[in-house]
């Protein structure tokens, strides 16, 4: 079911999104990673992480990771999306180039597993900035919050992104939520003042996202009560 959601949403969003170019990185062919041993906190008081997700053969493949007790088979595995960790604990990062060697791939896989496990071990909501690469030079940043209490990933849609970014980035994000965080649901946070809000609501409603009341206990914990009326919330429950 999630495969259907990803493909349908990416196709529709590719036709609907009209915006400025997304951010660029000056790295062309090298893989990058940065890390920090100290934990950082967001303005909302949550621990904060920055994770990079990349697509295509330019990036290394994941290796099977240990799963938690609520292990499930992922219907998105055939996409074979590639992932990497950009920063373990801070949103600002220093980049270091790594050669495409087997030892580097092994190190990155171990590093990724450790960071994901650290996120899953957090007892309170955790902020995750997802840097979703479309090419080695282009990416979009999606701000999310993972709530371990309800096992939900809350996603703020970027204000601007290109057709290509909207298609591939959302697929990568859904895969990350289902395969890495093993979420039970994804909640989208859509600002009411967006010009493309009607199209977004129709798109996500078509593939199974349902409205969530701002007063619902499933509403995002990271948005202040007085600001929740500025957003529309839509939830999709991930089937096991």
Swiss-Prot record:
Q: In which tissues is it expressed?
A: Preferentially expressed in adult female midguts.
GO BP terms: namely: positive regulation of protein catabolic process; viral translational frameshifting
Show the InterPro entries listed in the entry. Acyl_CoA_acyltransferase, ODC_AZ, ODC_AZ_sf
Bias type Low complexity, positions: 34-43
Gene Ontology cellular component? Answer: cytoplasm; nucleus
Q: Where is the composition biased (Basic and acidic residues)?
A: 69-84
**What GO molecular function annotation could you give as one example from this UniProt entry?**
ornithine decarboxylase inhibitor activity
Functional summary from the UniProt entry: Ornithine decarboxylase (ODC) antizyme protein that negatively regulates ODC activity and intracellular polyamine biosynthesis and uptake in response to increased intracellular polyamine levels. Binds to ODC monomers, inhibiting the assembly of the functional ODC homodimer, and targets the monomers for ubiquitin-independent proteolytic destruction by the 26S proteasome.
* Assembly and binders: Interacts with ODC1 and thereby sterically blocks ODC homodimerization.
Output this protein's name. Answer: Ornithine decarboxylase antizyme
Organism of origin is: Aedes aegypti
């Amino acid at each position: 079911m999630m495969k259907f959601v990803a493909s349908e949403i990416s196709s529709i969003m590719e036709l609907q999104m009209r915006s400025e170019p997304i951010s660029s990185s000056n790295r062309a062919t090298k893989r990058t990673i940065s890390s920090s041993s100290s934990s950082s906190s967001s303005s909302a008081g949550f621990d904060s992480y920055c994770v990079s997700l990349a697509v295509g053969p330019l990036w290394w493949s994941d290796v099977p990771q240990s799963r938690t007790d609520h292990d499930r088979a992922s219907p998105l595995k055939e996409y074979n999306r590639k992932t990497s960790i950009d920063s373990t604990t801070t949103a600002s990062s220093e980049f270091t180039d790594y050669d495409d060697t087997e030892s580097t791939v092994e190190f990155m896989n171990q590093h990724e597993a450790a960071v994901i496990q650290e996120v899953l071990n957090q007892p309170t909501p955790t902020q995750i900035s997802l840097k979703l690469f479309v090419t080695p030079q282009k990416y979009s940043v999606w701000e999310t919050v993972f709530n371990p209490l309800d096992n939900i990933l809350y996603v703020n849609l970027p204000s601007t992104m290109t057709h290509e970014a909207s298609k591939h980035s959302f697929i990568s994000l859904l895969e990350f939520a289902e395969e890495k965080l093993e979420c039970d649901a994804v909640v989208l946070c859509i600002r009411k003042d967006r010009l493309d809000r009607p199209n977004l609501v129709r798109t996500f409603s078509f593939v199974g996202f349902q409205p969530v009341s701002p007063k619902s206990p499933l509403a995002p914990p990271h948005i202040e009560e007085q600001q929740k009326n500025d957003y529309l919330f839509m939830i999709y429950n991930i089937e096991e």
